[in-house]
Amino acid sequence: MIAPVSREVVLVHGMSHGGWAWERLARRLERDGHRVMAPDLPGHGRRAHERRHASLAAYARAVADAAIQAGFSRATIVGHSMGGAVLPGVAALIPARIARLVFLAAVVPAHGTTTLQGHITPAGRQMMHGLARANDLAIQYPALFEWSRWMGDLPLGDPRVSETLPRLTPQPLRPLTERVDMRRFHALRLPCTYIRCLRDAAVTPPRAAEYAARLGVTPIDMDCAHNPMLSAVDELAKILTTLD
């Protein structure tokens, strides 16, 4: 009998989340013998006090440092939601340590565009800038909006929702307004996977299909909302650990 392959996995959280968002998935992967890192990006999670240092470059460095410190040499790096805009920077920093990049319900910016410019409608951008101006250049959505947009496949009273909502922190505006340089990413031609969530209200299925096409891949579909690391842990773990 062939022993299962132990994988190195780095989990990159999205907007307003932290490394804590991956706790259920990380436990599942570690139980099966995989090595997992789920760093907090600057301004998030246990690093929420570093909000003023948040940038795409700082995000990418935090992920690269986590992989290096763990001694990973062939890592699967998973970027969720806004984390998709972080992966090109990570690829440029540590290409030799990456086996595959996985975009999970993630934005895939076109070269030279910003996350807000490429993903959010003009009205949505106006709203987000207004929220940021009122909150020290960081965006905090109302809790009901966060639930419906990110966790709509779970009842509002579900423990996974009630545990998550209080842990969400204001999202620094700056990384969302920085232009993403995709040239090095495209030149590296690293293996990529896109996972599309069919009940996603944040990265809708048609938009996710556009992002997958931008990567030149056919998306893998999951029947869930935006946060499968909460609502579809086993299925997500299986996908991540059976990629070539």
List PLM regions with ranges.
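Conserved HGGG/HGGXW glycine-rich cap/lid loop of the alpha/beta-hydrolase fold
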Residues: 6-48
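Flexible "cap/lid" loop of the alpha/beta hydrolase fold
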Residues: 92-93, 97-139, 174-176, 204
